[in-house]
């Protein structure tokens, strides 16, 4: 899969940088991998539920070419002080501390483990536009970028679903974050102006046209420093697993996503612990909320959809406890503004971004009003971007 793009200022600058770092630009190929927003369905993916994400036009660009030896050479425009990171193909099992090169090593390990032959080194220059710790999936964007780079350079013909699953495996088994498949799936399967309703239990999915009429999706970035591995992500994963285990003593279920709200409420005594009940209630209620939200979205009932965004945020705040001052200030201030149908945090939480459904004509006033309140409460500014929904990870044919 590839898309034709014009040689933009960004690509020209990256081409020059590639020549500066690696000597010339012979046989260089171009690639792009998006970030993602999740419209609704948060922390449901690893609980066997539904998610409703879309890939966005902010992402990670890569320039790559094969080498004739065994060396892998990497350079990131985002971390120029690191210079060129170099390792041997025989050394991919050994992690590089906390460096971004681990995502490259992880994808090599997973592809080779799946039986694909990666028998030469390569050079890769990347530039990520996704703000670090924004909750817009910079890590999954990089994993899938590396996936499409290796797939193309080594002519592997990896089925897209397998590539997505290997991206998740890299995150889980190499990096050590117990994430579900939401991020990699959204980034691997994204299409222009379409969201994806994905059942994370079966991996059945439906592409849903994004028809917002006079509304925009505004991304609001807290700009709070955050590392996913330092957040309570793995803790929430463990808590919902424990709640499921306790419910399985009586109920024949494989995941919390199989339960209706009523079935869950009737069996909370099986869990016993109040904190675990809250965690599991979010997973169950959010999953059912997502199914209703998608139907409202398709029917063009954006008012109902917005109300469900608000309910999602409240559940993430009160039951799942993954929001915090910054995200609550953004989402709750946004919900009070003129022209706003709904707002909620998106991504893992603990920082990162929130989204709001805002009338197009109100966006400027909205950003000003929410920005002022946020800076007053938190002490530093938020950033705002209107989301454009674009294609998934792909090779670029540059004209």
Curated annotation (Swiss-Prot):
What UniProt keywords are attached to this protein's entry? ATP-binding, Carbohydrate metabolism, Cytoplasm, Galactose metabolism, Kinase, Magnesium, Metal-binding, Nucleotide-binding, Transferase
UniProt keyword Metal-binding, yes or no? yes
- Annotated catalytic residues: 183 (proton acceptor)
Family label? Belongs to the GHMP kinase family. GalK subfamily.
- Can you cite an annotated GO cellular component? cytosol
Q: Which domain of life is it from?
A: Bacteria
Top EC category: transferase
Residues at site: Transition state stabilizer? 36
Q: Which GO BP annotation is one of this protein's?
A: galactose metabolic process
Organism of origin: Lactococcus lactis subsp. cremoris (strain MG1363)
Put simply, this protein is called: Galactokinase
Gene Ontology terms, MF aspect: ATP binding; galactokinase activity; magnesium ion binding
Indicate where this protein is primarily found: cytoplasm
Which gene underlies this protein? galK
- What is the documented function of this protein? Catalyzes the transfer of the gamma-phosphate of ATP to D-galactose to form alpha-D-galactose-1-phosphate (Gal-1-P).
Q: Which residues bind Mg(2+)?
A: 139, 171
Per UniProt, substrate binds at 42-45, 233
NCBIfam families recorded for this chain?
gal_kin (TIGR00131), PRK05322.1 (NF003705)
Q: Where in the cell is it found?
A: Cytoplasm
Upper lineage is:
Bacteria, Bacillati, Bacillota, Bacilli, Lactobacillales
């Amino acid at each position: 899969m590839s898309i034709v793009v014009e040689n933009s200022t960004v690509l020209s600058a990256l081409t020059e940088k590639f020549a500066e770092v690696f000597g010339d630009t012979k046989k260089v190929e171009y690639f792009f991998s998006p970030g993602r927003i999740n419209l609704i369905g948060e922390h449901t993916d690893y609980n066997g539920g539904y998610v409703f994400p879309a890939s966005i036009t902010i992402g990670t660009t890569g320039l790559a070419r094969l080498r004739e030896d065994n060396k892998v050479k990497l350079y990131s425009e985002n971390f120029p002080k690191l210079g060129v990171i170099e390792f041997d193909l025989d050394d991919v099992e050994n992690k590089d501390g906390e460096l971004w090169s681990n995502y490259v090593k992880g994808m090599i390990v997973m592809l080779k483990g799946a039986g694909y032959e990666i028998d030469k080194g390569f050079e890769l220059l990347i530039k990520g536009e996704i703000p670090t710790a924004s909750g817009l999936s910079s890590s999954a964007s990089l994993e899938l970028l590396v996936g499409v780079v290796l797939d193309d350079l080594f002519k592997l013909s990896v089925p897209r679903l397998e590539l997505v699953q290997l991206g998740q495996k890299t995150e889980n088994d190499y990096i050590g974050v117990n994430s579900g498949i939401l991020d990699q799936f959204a980034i691997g399967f994204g299409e222009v102006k379409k969201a994806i309703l994905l059942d994370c239990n079966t991996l059945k999915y439906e592409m849903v046209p994004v028809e917002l009429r006079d509304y925009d999706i505004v991304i609001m970035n807290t700009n709070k420093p955050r590392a996913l591995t330092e957040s309570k992500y793995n803790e929430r994963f463990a808590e919902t697993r424990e709640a499921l285990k306790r419910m399985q003593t009586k109920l024949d279920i494989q995941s919390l996503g199989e339960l209706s709200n009523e079935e869950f409420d009737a069996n909370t005594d099986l869990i016993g612990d109040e904190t675990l009940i809250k965690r599991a209630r979010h997973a169950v209620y959010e999953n059912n909320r997502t199914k209703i939200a998608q139907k409202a979205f398709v029917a063009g009932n954006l008012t109902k959809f917005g109300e469900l965004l608000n309910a999602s945020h409240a559940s993430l705040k009160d039951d799942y406890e993954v929001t915090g001052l910054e995200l609550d200030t953004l989402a709750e201030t946004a919900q009070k503004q003129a022209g706003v149908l709904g707002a909620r945090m998106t991504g893992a939480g603990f920082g990162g971004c929130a989204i709001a459904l805002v009338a197009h004509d109100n966006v400027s006033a909205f950003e000003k009003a929410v920005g002022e309140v946020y800076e007053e409460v938190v002490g530093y500014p938020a950033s705002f971007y209107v989301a454009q929904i674009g294609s998934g990870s792909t090779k670029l044919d540059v004209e």
